[in-house]
């Protein structure tokens, strides 16, 4: 794949998962041996099925919209900074929904291999984000 194709894969990943809520798109875009380094998670997310579970859990709790602010790529790596809007719509880790909405920016780095996302690094201020949504300090 070309660098431009890598960038298009990452843009599609974000659109399908967050904006279209299509977790099944991971069957095509996510490598079976995916590794996710997700800020705030105590352990690595390992494998396509674990990745699907992670996204499904977030999408069950929040209405989310993601807009990329910028994107660049070199070799097999793609970096993107996103502006994220979310609203609490269902239980989150046993806490009832607050109905509040908030914004967040994130920085993601993706490693592409064989036309799929093989590895992802996600950084964001989860604590501030959850406080803005009314969940208090975590």
Say what each PLM segment does.
Residues 1-138:
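C-terminal and inter-domain tail/linker signature
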């Amino acid at each position: 794949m070309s660098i431009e194709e890598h960038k298009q894969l990452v843009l599609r990943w974000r659109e399908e998962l967050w904006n279209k809520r299509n977790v099944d798109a991971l069957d095509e875009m996510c490598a079976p041996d995916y590794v996710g380094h997700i800020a705030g998670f105590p352990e690595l997310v390992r494998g396509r099925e674990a990745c699907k579970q992670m996204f499904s859990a977030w999408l069950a709790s929040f209405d989310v919209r993601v807009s990329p602010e910028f994107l660049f790529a070199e070799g097999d790596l793609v970096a993107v900074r996103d502006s994220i809007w979310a609203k609490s719509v269902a239980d989150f880790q046993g806490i009832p929904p607050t109905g509040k909405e908030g914004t967040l920016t994130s920085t993601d780095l993706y490693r592409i291999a064989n036309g799929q996302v093989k590895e992802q690094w996600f950084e964001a201020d989860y604590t501030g984000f959850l406080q803005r949504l009314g969940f208090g300090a975590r």
